[in-house]
């Protein structure tokens, strides 16, 4: 795997260094005073930068009409699956990465155990194969390489992609319809929750169809970042140029929990209508992106028959 970040501008290299510092500090803090053996022995084995900043295809255009900026996408590999629980061990790191003023770019990170990553590679998951091929090691406890990836036959990739697309896209569409009905009868919080679920399923549809992987997360910012990394056309759905656009997305991102359980969650009819319109745009784009991918896999499978 690659180890140099020389292609990244110095200012962003400093932001990456700060990101590593925060991940290490907060993980160590989460494990201090631990009594369980797996916590005492808990270690970060590797931290890998992947996505556009690893591939040198990043975009940083915050002042254009779309306001698009590539995120830092990071894979943290730990030595025990129990340590991958974001709410238990990583929520403070997540919060600091959002609030730290030295880090201007959004940081989206996922955590997996070494066994999970190696198993995924052996099973031919394209998401992890791509990280192994294109990722940059920012930190490693030792230089033990990741497992060699298995290359799936085109027919098998086609089979899995088709199943994911058919199932997830239908669910995403249904949630959007239910959200619209809830809004029509002024069930605001229910409409927000259902729209969140539509977006979650839409982005997961892209990730599973194209890579056979989606993080176990309800955080729309993570799912959006990873999905847009697969196909930049998806960024057209949710512009970021204006504060009101970013604020609306933040409010719907909170809906998974707060729209159901918080007495203080509020979202306006105007925001929900705009978010519903943008979700419809996203669903149309997801349909195109996934259909294109399935068609390409079908052509590849036909050539091998």
Residue ranges and their predicted role:
Residues 15, 23, 43, 296-305:
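Charged interaction patches that mediate protein-protein contacts
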Residues 44-58:
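Short gly/ser-rich loop at a beta-strand->alpha-helix junction or flexible surface loop bordering the NTP-binding
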Residues 7, 82-96, 101-305:
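Terminal alpha-helical segments
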Residues 2-34, 41, 58-121:
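Metal-dependent nucleotidyltransferase catalytic core
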Residues 38-40, 249-250:
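A general structural signal for short secondary-structure junctions and capping/turn motifs
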């Amino acid at each position: 795997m690659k180890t140099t970040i020389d292609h990244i501008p110095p200012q962003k290299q400093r932001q990456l260094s700060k990101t590593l510092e925060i991940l290490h500090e907060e993980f160590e803090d989460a494990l201090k005073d631990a009594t369980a053996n797996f916590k005492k022995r808990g270690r970060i084995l590797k931290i890998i930068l992947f996505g556009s900043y690893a591939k040198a295809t990043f975009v940083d255009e915050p002042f254009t009409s779309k306001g698009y900026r590539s995120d830092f996408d990071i894979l943290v590999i730990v030595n025990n699956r129990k340590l991958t629980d974001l709410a238990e061990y990583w929520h403070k790191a997540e919060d600091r990465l959002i609030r730290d003023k030295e880090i201007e770019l959004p940081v989206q990170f996922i955590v997996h155990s070494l066994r999970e990553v190696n198993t995924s590679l052996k099973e031919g998951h394209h998401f992890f194969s791509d990280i192994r091929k294109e990722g940059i090691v920012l930190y490693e406890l030792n230089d033990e390489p990741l497992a060699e990836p298995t290359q799936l036959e085109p027919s098998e990739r086609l089979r899995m992609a088709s199943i994911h697309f058919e199932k997830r896209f239908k669910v995403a569409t249904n949630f959007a319809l239910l959200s619209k009905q809830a809004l029509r009868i002024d069930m605001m919080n229910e409409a927000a929750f259902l729209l969140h679920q539509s977006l979650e399923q839409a982005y997961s549809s892209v990730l599973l169809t194209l890579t056979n992987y989606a993080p176990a997360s309800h955080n729309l910012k993570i799912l959006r970042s990873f999905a847009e990394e697969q196909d930049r056309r998806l960024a057209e759905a949710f512009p970021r140029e204006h504060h009101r656009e970013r604020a609306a997305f933040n409010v719907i991102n909170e809906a998974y929990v707060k729209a159901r359980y918080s007495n203080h969650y509020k979202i306006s009819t105007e925001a929900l209508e705009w978010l519903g319109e943008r979700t419809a745009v996203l669903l149309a784009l997801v349909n195109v992106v996934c259909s294109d991918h399935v068609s390409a896999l079908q052509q590849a499978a036909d050539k091998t028959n």
